[in-house]
Amino acid sequence: MKSKTSFFNRTVFKKNVTLYWPIWVCYLLYGMVKVPGQLWSRLQQQTDMTAYARDYALYNSLRLEVDVAAIAIMAVVCGMALFGYLFTQKNAYMIHALPVTRGELYVTNMISGLCFLLIPQALVFLVTVVLCLLKGIASVQFLGLWFLSVMGIAFFLYATVCFCVMFTGQLFALPVYFLAVNYVAFAFSSGARYVIGYLGYGLGMDTVPEFLILRILSPMNYLYNNVRFVFRQSYNQETDLMSGVLSYRGLRVLAAYVAAAVVIYLITYYCYKKRRIESAGDLISFNWVKPLFRWGVGLSLIHI
């Protein structure tokens, strides 16, 4: 009788949840303070509970700029914890000697990390919905957009972390690789514009074209600037009242990054299947990447 092929191991998943519970608990506490906690505090400070005051308090609680940074930090921490066995040879050999396939390990750790990120977000969303209903805030559709946004951002950034994990065998190189992947294109673009603007007579930085593809290849910066809530305020002199319109932009950008994340997860799965166990402890885990790394560092130093 053939044994069934599995891509998920309950024992490993349970171990991840129980061993690394401080990670998702800390993220849950952050979410509770940042969204429902801040919203409740702002509403309590209002003496005149107008529609403008409610929407403005909701806008400040749902701002995604802080969430992008928080999700990035949590994604890196999850990657360092869940794939930590790949960074020491003793643990790498021990884990891969168990009756668990690499596919099971990868998928289980991937799902574990996503659960650490998405479940706290879901709980924060539910608590905030209840708070909005109790306080008479009708714009709950923006809570749904916030929830979709943080889920999409977490899904993509954790894919980037998993991808970076496969290319290094050192624990503290992971956050460096993650930042490099997210900002190297932006750094080269900004540096090139600065150099051209500085050396080109009569040229300013604003006159040098900025290519869209380079901005897209800097995901954190692009998400930070293009997936957000906007609150447009206006003042009516006749009624002496402030009014505001809350809106959201960036859903298509988010959908594109989520689609890219699916591809990244599949590529990472293939890389894990090909990764050498003995590369644990190496700065770069694939030999064919080492020349590219040297050239990249050299060009970066010249650029600086």
What are these regions (language model features)?
Residues 302-304:
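Conserved small/polar residues in nucleotide/adenosyl-binding loops
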Residues 82-118, 280:
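Helix-loop-helix units of permease transmembrane domains in multi-pass membrane transporters
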Residues 57-60, 64, 111-174, 186-189, ...:
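Secretory targeting signals
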Residues 18-46, 66-77, 180-186, 296-300:
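Hydrophobic alpha-helical transmembrane segments of multi-pass membrane transport/permease proteins
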Residues 68-72, 247-263:
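Alpha-helical transmembrane segments
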Residues 1-27:
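Aromatic- and glycine-rich beta-strand/loop motifs that create alpha-glucan
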Residues 63-91:
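Long, hydrophobic alpha-helical segments
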Residues 174-209:
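Transmembrane helix segments
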